[in-house]
């Protein structure tokens, strides 16, 4: 398994099938909320240095990604936060340490870039809490969602 930081814009065509698999596996309200990535906004955020994309590859094949939005804290201007947009490992690579390796690689790279807080959210119906807790992450808040139309 090889981990890299890559340009989301550059790998758009390659990542799209994984994003579709991820959406069909995990997304709620699929009848109402269709997958429709805003590639222009991703590109703008990336050009501003506010979007970081980390990838997992096996023999050059993309098998996972971890995409984060990086911003100064609105309440904590002395700190830079990296918040998960999406994180995904193809099912056939979840048994090993691919997820751990991808998160650890991203954490190291983000720290080099001056990020002081890494925030990873998980779906309540598909958590990976044990992995995060084993990596010294703490449960810090709960998130509720309601489709309102």
Predicted feature residues:
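A conserved beta-turn-beta hairpin within the catalytic core of GNAT-like acetyltransferases
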Residues: 72-84, 140
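Conserved acetyl-CoA-binding loop-helix of GNAT-fold acetyltransferases
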Residues: 95-108
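Short amphipathic alpha-helix that is part of the acyltransferase structural core
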Residues: 1-37
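Conserved acetyl-CoA-binding loop of GNAT-fold acetyltransferases
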Residues: 132-142
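Conserved beta-strand in the GNAT
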Residues: 55, 61-70
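Conserved beta-strand-loop-alpha-helix junction that forms the acyl-donor binding cleft
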Residues: 118-129, 148
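A short, internal acetyl-CoA/4′-phosphopantetheine-binding micro-motif in the GNAT/acyltransferase core
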Residues: 85-95
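A short helix-loop-beta-strand connector motif used in the catalytic cores of GNAT acetyltransferases and
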Residues: 43-55
